[in-house]
Amino acid sequence: MQAYFEQIEKVRYEGSQSDNPFAFRHYNPDQEILGKRMADHLRFAVAYWHTFCWNGADMFGVGSFARPWQQSGDALELAKRKADIAFEFFQKLSVPYYCFHDVDIAPEGNSLKEYLHNFAVITDVLAEKQQDSGVKLLWGTANCFTHPRYGAGAATNPDPDVFAWAATQVFTAMNATKKLGGENYVLWGGREGYETLLNTDLRQEREQIGRFMQMVVEHKHKIGFQGTLLIEPKPQEPTKHQYDYDVATVYGFLKQFGLEKEIKVNVEANHATLAGHSFHHEIATAVALGVFGSVDANRGDPQLGWDTDQFPNSVEENTLIMYEILKAGGFTTGGLNFDAKVRRQSTDRYDLFHAHIGAMDTMALALKAAARMIEDDKLNQLVAKRYAGWNGELGQQILQGKASLESLAHYAESHQLAPQHQSGQQELLENLVNRHLYPK
């Protein structure tokens, strides 16, 4: 097979002084950070959909890329060619993982029978390529939002036949993910929401999607899938309002249906932007609620109101992300999936390398800065000092349920309390962060 990226042999670490645009300047996979290899901290993955399925089309223009697997011809053979090139890319980029939707890797066909056949064929192709290359599957998922049948949602659709079709896709994709050794399975409700409340029964749709997720959990245990189930929050787009709005909303949903011990979250930076949150907020919230699982590493444009899915390039933003992840003990089954696409004008095939190399270097720099913050521990100490009172007798009585409003009122009166505000020292904390971002 002729190489598609014939100008590149393999992307390697060459250090910060390198001028080679096809080399890592900061991502050194074998460098030890806090007792663990950098590669094991970051667990990078390439997104099959944006990298190999998007053709450069947007709302105002047709596709601008000329990818050989996107030409006319036998759909299944083109899917095999796409897999060849995808694994060439993974290996030359030296990335350990990839992620996919079912219809990213295999043509959907014109019937359920064709879908199942095509998916089975390509699953076998990917299994062989994983065996040959050592590249692994971080997570799989099913696309239950693109086809016109899902115009009113999948699990929340008013037609139970559509619900059943979606269940078939998820059933098949979960089985394929298990077969391929996937470490997670993701559920993103692209159209699980509404465009108008005039034709929407909120209670009915919530019960439907709750039952759907319960069935997903049941199937996970039935087939013995050892990976983590993940829901990916997003507030809107393509619908006006989506039920998995943000991390806190997803947690409330999981609690309602008794799933908070079964499902975690896959947090995407750009989705946090759309929800009016910082990426830092969503990661910290997921950690605080005990549902942090994985990350879609990208960025949005604060001046635009849609999901731009750009590659991450802010060391400042991502240092705080990696700091939260390190404090929480790091990834277990999750990782950093680049749910990002090159710009429509970036039509050179090698732009795919520039995008991923830059993003991987960005996250490597962020990891190193976050590790310095962990080792220094001053930020953590200042936060602990701020809440130290809660470790005392009064604080513990309150938290342990041994105090009431009445007893606290008596305490305040008998001790003639006159508490004074203590400085939050935000500026000092920001200076501490900058000290580790720019150590020289």
From Swiss-Prot:
It comes from Pectobacterium carotovorum subsp. carotovorum (strain PC1). Belongs to the xylose isomerase family. Mg(2+) binds at residues 307, 309. This is Xylose isomerase. Binds 2 magnesium ions per subunit. GO terms for biological process: D-xylose metabolic process. One of its GO terms (molecular function) is xylose isomerase activity. Its main location: cytoplasm. NCBIfam families: PRK05474.1 (NF003998), xylose_isom_A (TIGR02630).
